[in-house]
Every structure is written in structure tokens, then in C-alpha cells.
Curated annotation (Swiss-Prot):
It comes from Bos taurus (Bovine). Disulfide bonds join 24-146, 48-134, 83-99, 95-113. This is Lysozyme C, milk isozyme. Belongs to the glycosyl hydrolase 22 family. Its EC number is 3.2.1.17.
Length: 148
């Protein structure tokens, strides 16, 4: 009985953690979903962004006390502007999706929303982590050995 309980708890913890991509697995997935070169943003920039925003974790969330918004998913897309979580005041929901869609292991909707973000005038600069960790850096290591 104890063993069954332990197995159940382990399965629950895996379900809560979501999918944590490996670097090359993410690079291949993003390429397949059309992010390589989208709006002039290289695949290496997208992988770098995901590394520093979520550590490649689809279930990452971060609450922002200042404006009471939350960042969701592998790209940490914000509920103030891009998705609806039902609790962020004055949310815009420009991607027209529930924020929960950004937490799925299948990142198709997260990629579609990220494409929407970079179509705005700020482009990829909308992400602070990209500006701080990826901008003007040699990013080849993010796709090196990935055969993409």
C-alpha cells in the first residue's frame, strides 16, 4: 500500500512539473513550429530566451506583485497583455487564449502567442530576459550540435 502511495505521489509531481525540454529537443520543436527566422529572430535567440525565462519548463509561472499579473509557460508570456487568466486586472489578451494554454507540454499555442508578441513594435525586446541574457551575445551554443 505504501509503495502505491509513493508511486501516486511521484506521478502527481511529474504532472505538476510539466515538460522540461532538453535544449536540442526544444530547438528542433521551435524550428518545426516555424520560429527559426520569424520576424528576423534566429532560432538561437528563441532557445536562449526560453532558457532564461523558464529554464525550458512548460509549466513555469511567475507572479508579478506590482501589476498583479503572471508570466506563463516556456516563454513566460504575461497575463497583463497576452493571455487571460481570469484574475489579472485590465488584461488585454492580445493572443486571445487562456493562460493555461501556455502551460501545456504541447507548445504550439505558446509559439503562436510568442509570434504575436514579436509582431508588436518592441519585437523580441519585449522580453527582459532576452535583453539581459541574449541580446548582442554569441548564441551559437544554444543550437550547437542540435542538427537544426
Amino acid at each position: 500500500m505504501k509503495a502505491l502511495l509513493i508511486v501516486g505521489l511521484l506521478l502527481l509531481s511529474v504532472a505538476v512539473q510539466g515538460k522540461k525540454f532538453q535544449r536540442c529537443e526544444l530547438a528542433r520543436t521551435l524550428k518545426k513550429l516555424g520560429l527559426d527566422g520569424y520576424r528576423g529572430v534566429s532560432l538561437a535567440n528563441w532557445v536562449c530566451l526560453a532558457r532564461w525565462e523558464s529554464n525550458y519548463n512548460t509549466r513555469a509561472t511567475n507572479y508579478n506583485r506590482g501589476d498583479k499579473s503572471t508570466d506563463y509557460g516556456i516563454f513566460q508570456i504575461n497575463s497583463r497583455w497576452w493571455c487571460n487568466d481570469g484574475k489579472t486586472p485590465k488584461a488585454v489578451n492580445a493572443c486571445r487564449i487562456p493562460c493555461s494554454a501556455l502551460l501545456k507540454d504541447d507548445i504550439t499555442q505558446a509559439v503562436a502567442c510568442a509570434k504575436r508578441v514579436v509582431r508588436d513594435p518592441q519585437g523580441i525586446k519585449a522580453w527582459v530576459a532576452w535583453r539581459n541574457k541574449c541580446q548582442n551575445r554569441d548564441l551559437r551554443s544554444y543550437v550547437q550540435g542540435c542538427r537544426v
